[in-house]
């Protein structure tokens, strides 16, 4: 597990079999450099409905999510092996759960103080989890 820049990952060239990029920024050049031929990238990106209920509370206007479809998953030098969507609803049943969810998202830092305060006062919240999975394989030549 490494947290670092995707543009210049601190790893040797062609030394990685699998990259999992969760809600991150895709760097074709950086990933291509460190991934072995035939290696795999697993991309997890939020769908349009991901945490929509939370976003409706903390933002005055809810913008459409930047989904995997709009990121042009097809990358030169890679083959798309599989795409799948995970969509389900979950109920947070305590103030602590709502606060933990908010803190673990970038929304905590993007929302206004008023938006954060509104969410932090909730004792429960129905949320939608909407995640797009895409598996790409580096071409061998």
Task: Mark where each language-model region is.
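Conserved SAM/SAH-binding loop
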Residues: 4-8, 24-25
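A short acidic, Gly/Pro-enriched loop at the edge of an enzyme's catalytic core
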Residues: 7-19
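Short catalytic micro-motifs in class I SAM-dependent methyltransferases
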Residues: 18, 23-26
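Active-site capping/gating segments
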Residues: 62-100
């Amino acid at each position: 597990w490494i947290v670092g820049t995707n543009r210049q990952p601190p790893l040797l060239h062609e030394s990685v079999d699998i990259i999992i990029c969760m809600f991150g920024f895709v760097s074709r050049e950086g990933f291509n450099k460190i991934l072995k031929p035939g290696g795999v990238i697993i991309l997890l990106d939020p769908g349009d409905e991901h945490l929509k209920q939370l976003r409706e509370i903390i933002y005055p206007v809810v913008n459409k999510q930047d989904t995997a479809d709009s990121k042009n998953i097809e990358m030169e030098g890679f083959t798309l092996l599989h795409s799948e969507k995970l969509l389900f609803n979950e109920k947070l049943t305590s103030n602590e759960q709502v606060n933990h969810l908010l803190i673990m998202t970038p929304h905590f830092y993007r929302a206004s103080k008023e938006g954060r305060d509104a969410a932090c006062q909730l004792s429960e919240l129905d949320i939608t989890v909407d995640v797009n999975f895409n598996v790409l394989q580096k071409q061998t030549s």
